[in-house]
Amino acid sequence: MAKTVMTMPPRMSTEEWQTRLDLAACYRLVDLFGWSDLVNTRVTARVPGQHDQFLINPYGLLYDEVTASSLVKIDAEGNKVDPSESDINSGGFAIPSTIHMARPEVACVLHTHSIAGCAVSMQRDGLLPLNQHALQIIGDIACHDYEGAGRSAEGRARLLADLDDRHILVLRNHGLLIVGTSIAAAFIATYRMERACAMQLAFQQSGAAFHPITDEVVSAASNRPTGGRNEPAKFEWPALLRRLDRIDPSYKQ
């Protein structure tokens, strides 16, 4: 694969190009961490300065094929804003669009079908307060019951009500949906949730007795939402981009 880094296209704002770079990097990182599902699921980002314009992956590309220039700009209904030969999964954009339009602070919506996330979504009690990783996010998690593959307006309204003002939504029997005030925030919240889910599964498989955390500590964590904060942009996100650049910087094309 060619690794030439592309410069910003003419007539595109610096802010949009930076968002494209971050979103393409996010797709590559989701794949690198093992959370992708062939060409299914998606990560969407709001175009800076545009309330109703968004970037999404071209339908049919694997996550490790997505580049900054291949991302498709669409409106809230899934219509292409700029000419593009690429198709998108317009049906799959219905839920992200609903969230983006209802919550203007949400810059990124990240949806996964990961093994750990799906496995925990199938458990009656969802993510349990078993360890420090879970407690970091436990107060920022909501759940939404599976309603089939349909995307009716009523179903989207119920999903939005369940998410409320939180940033992590367990889609029961389906997967995870994470929102963030930046692409970096959404990715790091996903990392924390995926890590906590994997730890829960590993513990459950061990068959060992659980050493409980006190109710006071769990209660304090439950009342301290942290999942969508922007701090990850300061340290973790640049570090992840450096790692990606060492592996394959072609996402910048």
Predicted regions and their residues:
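Glycine-rich flexible loops
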Residues: M1-Q253
